[in-house]
Amino acid sequence: MTSFTRILAYENGELDLDDTIALFQELVNSGIAWELQGHYGRTAMEFVRAGYITLP
């Protein structure tokens, strides 16, 4: 599944927690999390603070 497809699945509520965390780790690693709507950057930082994902 491409990042775009996974983002659409996320926005449609179709991803479970593990898939959501994997998506946000991928978005952070690629830098895309900071270029999308503010929600993505804020959610990424929440996941970092909670220890679910790491900054590259």
Please provide the spans of the model-predicted regions.
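Catalytic phosphate/metal-binding cores of nucleic-acid and nucleotide-processing enzymes, i.e., regions
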Residues: 1-56
